């Protein structure tokens, strides 16, 4: 059997006291420190993950804002393009209306000039007919004399530039 003597008991008590002191002085502070360090590392990892998620959310938000700004830019450019086309179309329509107005006015003026010239020509013809008739009536003469008078009247009118 196993025999226990006093030395063995003292050694056992000394060893247990040494283990107790080691536990209190070295192991416990070491394990406390490692637990504390482990918790600090976990805390830092959690904080880093939290910051990474926040950064990702910020990035997504900025990407969304950039996308919205780009879409707004496209809308503004499209709207500006439509306005420019509208302005050009309106200007073309206005130019077309002015062109038509000017052409109508020119046609009316030409028609008035034509009518005025026709009235003046008719007035001259009537005047000439009256002049010739009065000359013929003044001299009631034969046919030869009549033709001679008409020729003289025509030549006279040609000289004056009325015919």
From Swiss-Prot:
Q: Where in the cell is it found?
A: Cell inner membrane
Q: Which UniProt keywords apply?
A: ATP synthesis, Cell inner membrane, Cell membrane, CF(0), Hydrogen ion transport, Ion transport, Membrane, Transmembrane, Transmembrane helix, Transport
Membrane topology annotation = Single-pass membrane protein
Superkingdom is: Bacteria
Q: Family, per the entry?
A: Belongs to the ATPase B chain family.
Role played:
F(1)F(0) ATP synthase produces ATP from ADP in the presence of a proton or sodium gradient. F-type ATPases consist of two structural domains, F(1) containing the extramembraneous catalytic core and F(0) containing the membrane proton channel, linked together by a central stalk and a peripheral stalk. During catalysis, ATP synthesis in the catalytic domain of F(1) is coupled via a rotary mechanism of the central stalk subunits to proton translocation.
Name the HAMAP family on file.
ATP_synth_b_bprime (MF_01398)
Subunit note = F-type ATPases have 2 components, F(1) - the catalytic core - and F(0) - the membrane proton channel. F(1) has five subunits: alpha(3), beta(3), gamma(1), delta(1), epsilon(1). F(0) has three main subunits: a(1), b(2) and c(10-14). The alpha and beta chains form an alternating ring which encloses part of the gamma chain. F(1) is attached to F(0) by a central stalk formed by the gamma and epsilon chains, while a peripheral stalk is formed by the delta and b chains.
Q: What is this protein called?
A: ATP synthase subunit b
Q: What organism, scientifically named, is this protein from?
A: Petrotoga mobilis (strain DSM 10674 / SJ95)
Lineage runs: Bacteria, Thermotogati, Thermotogota, Thermotogae, Petrotogales
Which gene is annotated as encoding this protein in its UniProt record? atpF
